[in-house]
Amino acid sequence: MMNLLFHRLKRPLAAAFVGASTTLAFAPYQLWPIAILSPAILLILLANQTPKRALWIGYAWGLGQFATGVSWVYVSISGFGGMPLIANLFLMGMLIAYLAVYSGLFAWLNNKFFPQFSLSKALLAAPALWLITDWLRGWVMTGFPWLWLGYSQIDAPLASFAPIGGVELLTLFVLISAGALAYAWIHKQWLMIIIPVVLMSAGFGIRQYDWVTPRPEDTTKVALIQGNVDQNLKWLPSQRWPTIMKYADLTRENWDADIIVWPEAAIPAFEVEVPSFLSNIDSAAKMNNSAIITGIVNQSEDRQFYNSILSLGVTPYGDYSFDMSERYHKHHLLPFGEFVPFEDILRPLAPFFNLPMSSFSRGAFVQPNIVANGMHMAPALCYEIIFNEQVRQNVTDETDFILTLSNDAWFGHSIGPLQHMEIARMRALELGKPLIRSTNNGLTAVTDYKGKIVEQVPQFETAVLRAELTPTDGTTPYRTFGTWPLYFWVALSLMLAWWLPRKKD
């Protein structure tokens, strides 16, 4: 009996272990070859298994990946959810169990429709199905496209392909490489190892090619204020003005910067509650030929709440006035943090489902760029930076920089903020635009148009990051075409993988 149980569980247990190791491919560890080896081993474990067995093996792999990869979510649940330990663990388990569904679905589809481990399955079907299930995870229930394998390649040779097809093209090449390794192992066709070698070599070969051209004559001095405000104290009425004045004092020391950036919701008040302060600092910025960008919470006349970005000082908007149409309003809201699905049912159950500021409304998917001191910035508030298509559609021909404001204080000393920064770097590389990332307690950083970090300040310190950023002219193929050519290839791959074995028969 025990032998039978062990026989049934050894592949799922091995898959869970391999899935758990995948987190090492991402920040802060960045052992990027693991992102290729992990799905390769998964494909080996799936070989010659029934669709039902494959589903559980793939599901176990996903349990391992997300148990380690999104462990940082537990920091927020336990620190701010107001629930007992058992409830925290249950919620975390539910999240991991849900996210693992997609790797289970991949494995089931892979073995149901392509039962033989042929070359077409390894190089065409498996990579295509992986991208489809990744896309589903990034779309269903507003989406959670975190830990896409392509992100792990930001400092690897494959990164050179990001301006061509985005992070999804990198994921495709990771899976093609994994499929080649798995095929080589199963069929002892060691020549197949040349496929990942060729892909890596091609990445090295094109890494020096610039899709965009820097404009050094428009180099801009920026100052990013990292306030390091305690999240537990931030919204207490007694802390409102100490927090606001902390940002104001640090700003006064940096009026020589062209653009000064405060993080997401830096001002712990509704905009309508602090008009005098905003008017005064708007005037001060104009007097110093500078501009200030800040995150702020807004309330419309019909009592809709928005997580917004406001630009003050030297802007095209004139003197400060409360005008909701001149703000950027966050579109992609964080589930449970900024909106609660099925809120009529969930809110009464536990404090976690009734957090402050968890009833926001959405802004439009595409909105005008933020303009400050003549520079145009495509904005993304916190979680939005992980949605590559939204960021892509908000970058225009006039865009100089990508701007992202965040508050990762919810996740403490976990790996979450480091993974978040890794994703933000990919947006800069994909779109050929320098990135400005201002946060409450880190990671506050700026990157060049290739996603390389130019300057950053330490986490968990009050600090000001000073840097000079050079905007770019031109565009990348990814910004022009998006991912539709890639998904055309995905559809073609599935058709070929289905047809080729039958042609031989």
Curated annotation (Swiss-Prot):
Residues 225-471 form the CN hydrolase domain. The active site is at 264 (proton acceptor), 330, 382 (nucleophile). InterPro entries: Apolipo_AcylTrfase (IPR004563), C-N_Hydrolase (IPR003010), C-N_Hydrolase_sf (IPR036526), LNT_N (IPR045378). SUPFAM superfamilies: Carbon-nitrogen hydrolase (SSF56317). GO terms for biological process: lipoprotein biosynthetic process. Signal peptide: none annotated. The chain crosses the membrane at residues 26-46, 66-86, 89-109, 129-149, 161-181, 186-206, 481-501. One of its GO terms (cellular component) is plasma membrane. Keywords: Acyltransferase, Cell inner membrane, Cell membrane, Membrane, Transferase, Transmembrane, Transmembrane helix. Its main location: membrane. GO terms for molecular function: N-acyltransferase activity. Belongs to the CN hydrolase family. Apolipoprotein N-acyltransferase subfamily. PANTHER family: APOLIPOPROTEIN N-ACYLTRANSFERASE (PTHR38686:SF1). Catalyzes the phospholipid dependent N-acylation of the N-terminal cysteine of apolipoprotein, the last step in lipoprotein maturation. This is Apolipoprotein N-acyltransferase.
